[in-house]
Amino acid sequence: MANLKIKIADNELVADGDHKALSEYKASFLDFVAKRDAFLAGERFELTEVPREEVIAENPQPAPNVKDEVVVIYDNAGIPSIMRRFSLMRNNELFEGGSTVEHPAFVIGGEVYDEIYISVYPNCNINGKPYSLPGMKPWTNVTIDDAANACFSKGDGWHLMTAPEWGLLANISLKNGTLPHGNTDCGHYHADHSEKGIPIESGSPYTLTGTGPATWTHDHTVTGVHDLCGNVYEFVRGIRFKDGEIQIATDNDAALPETDLSKNGSGWSSMAEPMFVDTSHGVVRFTKEKVENDTYEGGRWKDVECSEYTEGMKELAIYPGEPEVFCGIDGTEGERLAVRGGYWGGSSNYGVFCLNGSNPRAYTYTSIGFRSAYFKRKTDN
């Protein structure tokens, strides 16, 4: 058992976890980011000795039209999370055939937001609240509803990462040629075993958050969003498969606690162009006509059949952006929730475009975790 101690301003955060190691680099970077944030907020710190600043500066930067930054955001318990800021983007900036409409990740409660914040790391558990910190054991074995409630409990604007937010990161990664690698083979990247993370304990196939190389991020830089491929699947709020139909929350309204996404909740609706799943022919098919399914189907995206991937599907990364990765959906009667990204044991099946739509609402597993996201309400001026 080890403690993670991080000094921020005059306080010291002590987080207990069953991890056995913490990357010195990640700890230094976290300390630097915390000090920078406090400095910008008016605190005085000596920032002359920035850990590995030259390495960070030398990393390839995102495309010029992608404006983002790593920041520290504190929740209502006064504990920080390391977050990545993403500025407003439109569909035509993200994928082929996209219109000039704002990507839905930036439309919340009918209002367009200039920026949103996404956890840099899959979240860990500190006193029942989720946090984005490096070198921690991912919080798993939780239902999607409990994960959502834990995120909402952090305060106004905090929420479980949504389907549009995941789609945003997947599309950015594909467009910029930086599809993330990750822990897809017992702590290593299946295609290059020199890429590895720190195991949560000796012999474990799971890795501590953010301990892989820069290629394990959405933009292949050390300051990117980590671990979107492999290690643990991640819940996303605001998408489900109900009696074979793809149902979603409007825009990014899944970020709002008042959006009722319970089993019979009023927050669910069909896509703008309704889309159904056909699993009756041995492959996953997307169709605009409802069919009767009696089975689950799964395979690689390259084998999925669809006459046309709609703009709404592309917004959520429901298309073969990574042809070799897994897409599996239960199209039978009932409700199935989605997880994304894959876990530690799937080899080439897993990546940021991986989609598994087969789990009932109450399902929990050691290989399913989550991360929080945040937006600042426009009334918070």
Placement of each model-derived feature along the sequence:
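Charged, compositionally biased non-catalytic regions
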Residues: A41-E69
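Extracellular adhesion/carbohydrate-recognition regions
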Residues: I56, V66-G157, D243-F286, G369-S372
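Compositionally biased, non-globular sequence tracts
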Residues: M1-T48
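Extracellular interaction modules
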Residues: H19-S23, V112, T364-I368
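Short aromatic-cysteine micro-motif
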Residues: V101-L228
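Short secondary-structure boundary/capping segments
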Residues: L174-L179, R240, A249-D251
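C-terminal, surface-exposed recognition/capping segments
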Residues: G167, E195, I200-P205, T211, ...
